[in-house]
Regions:
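Structural signature of FAD isoalloxazine-binding scaffolds in flavoprotein oxidoreductases
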Residues: 1-19, 67-98, 111-118
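Short N-terminal helix-initiation segments at or just after the protein's N-terminus
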Residues: 28-32, 56-65, 100-102, 132-141
Length: 233
């Protein structure tokens, strides 16, 4: 989530040169860091490679997915990654194998100074119909549990795995009034870890709602929750 005022920093948007995807072998895919997660899942499906189905439900790109170890329905980027190619602050192109990446829940511990160029992934041969059916089922699960086709913050807070067995949505539900809003920023009725832009919510509206929820959960439950999304201001 980025400020709608001036941002005192540098934002790099990778061009179409980083949007390529191809097979390296029967079960290995190489994808540019600007390739969307959905496109990667579709490419894997078209080549009868399983293991990528969960990516069809994740918005964003390969680069961002690796950086935060994005995942859903029990699967994460670390489960399919072989290695990444990146460029350092000094301009050196390096390859980092997955075994050297300290993946955690929604984190990779990779340096913020790295710019990801591409990544290689390993799947396994699987019947095309089975892949399609799994993707359909995952999509149904997502649409039942999460707000879709509307403007939201996405999954906003991480589950506090080191503090409680409760999911973050459960903590929010018991700590924050469901009708709480700031401007046009409000809590989704379908999943309270998703915050909705009802029409014209500003950055500040959404930020205030996020901060209010975080403080309310801490006050009510004693659990300190951390944002899953990155906030740039």
């Amino acid at each position: 989530m980025i400020t709608d005022q001036k941002y005192n920093g540098v934002v790099i948007k990778l061009s179409n040169n980083f949007n390529n995807i191809s097979l390296l072998s029967d079960d290995i895919i190489i994808a540019g860091s600007a390739v969307s997660d959905k496109l990667l899942s579709e490419f894997a499906k078209d080549n009868s490679l399983g293991g990528f189905e969960f990516l069809s439900c994740i918005p964003g790109t390969v680069g961002g997915g690796i950086k935060m170890n994005a995942g859903c329905f029990g699967r994460e980027f670390k489960d399919i990654l072989i290695s990444i190619q990146a460029i350092t602050k000094s301009g050196q192109v390096i390859t980092i194998p997955v075994k050297e990446i300290n993946f955690k829940y929604r984190d990779s511990k990779l340096s913020d100074d790295l710019i990801f160029l591409s990544a290689s992934f390993k799947g396994f041969k699987k019947n095309l119909n089975l892949i399609e059916n799994e993707m359909i089922e995952l999509k149904k699960k997502k649409e039942l549990a999460q707000p879709t086709r509307i403007k939201t913050s996405g999954s906003t807070f991480k589950n506090p795995l080191d503090q409680t067995d409760k999911k973050v949505w459960q903590l929010i539900k018991e700590s924050v009034p469901a009708e709480k809003s700031f401007g046009d920023a409000c809590i989704s009725k379908k999943h309270c870890n998703f915050f909705v832009n009802k029409g014209d919510a500003k950055f500040e509206d959404m930020k205030r709602l996020i901060e209010f929820v975080s403080k309310s959960v801490l006050k009510k439950t004693g659990v300190k929750i951390e944002t899953e999304i990155k906030i740039l201001e």
